[in-house]
Amino acid sequence: MSASDPLLTQDQLALVEGLDALCSRHIDDKLLFDLDQQARYPFDVMQALSDGGWASMAVPESHGGAGASARDMAVVLEELSRHSLVVGQAYFSMWILGAEAVIRLGTNSQANEWLPRIATEGARVAFALTEPGSGSDAAALTTRAEKRGSDYVVTGQKVFTTGAAVADVIITAVRTSRGGTKHAGISTLMIDPQLQGVDIRKIPKMGLKGIDLCEVFFDDVVVPETCLLGELDAGWAGVLPGLAIERLYLAAISVGAMRDVLDLCLEHASTRETFGKALGSHQMIAEKLVEMRVAIETSRALVKQAAEMVDRGDGEAVNLASIAKLHATRSYVSATREAVQIFGGYGFTDEYPVSRHYRDCKYLEIGGGASEIQKIVIARSMGLRP
């Protein structure tokens, strides 16, 4: 195991050791191959994590959880993703994002219902924001929710909703009023995917096949007003804090996945011989491995900095999370490209996991705000944009 974190606290080290033991029992190369080839959600691994109490990490102690800090959650996601990017992404998308939204926006009744369900049952919560006509301009959403009596009637379409096909509830950003800027009049609803008028369709994709990206169609879906999450017309301000958390944790996931790539390359470079010596002893190959190690260390440092600021509640956390995501995700993409080069023709075959990393990595550079969006956020923080 290369590039482990030398600055872990004793509590964090215990988290890493516990996850390593669980993942070593439940995740192997065959499972990862099957999840990819069959486009199958890792139900068994996620159930094992839930049974072991790991779903409770992002839930406050007051609601049956562990109340983990952002620093600890970043450590958990790095370790999970070192074993399996799909499992790390599922853990983040289905448990952390949902818990964060309910903690921040939910009523007492909603918190009392959903937070214990996440903590003890591993309830799966999807988050639907992006629409076909908005893309990176996520605030330009058109899915609308009209108030009729004591209900909302929802009409519209979402796209690239992670895990919607397996979710117990879908937190959905909707437009509840017009007027003012596009950032105003936005609310969030907790929508039961089993309601009449909800249609979920999986989107075929090139990578990260073990967790679905979905289109979600809402055709006059009647949603009780008690499912309003947060204040009515809270606007983009109700959505934005969740995006900062998403960017931080996607960076942590990228660090873990990069560590797996480096481990695979180190093993291959030390066992394969070319021109009468180990592959890794060739200067050009060694240089690639060194660059991977440097990328891991710098990315992790940025993650730690951003996580510290999140825990402090510092307003600069949003910008630092964007910096961490920009650097870590593009470093992961670069590492996988070099990994395929190191493996040569073998890296181009499905038999070797670096090819899976090559297909998976691009999602992290796009999801949670593309790299170009992160640059805009960072430029704005530097006073370069209005």
Language-model-detected regions and their locations in the chain:
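Alpha-helical interface subdomain recognition
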Residues: M1-H83, V87, S93-M94, L105-Q110, ...
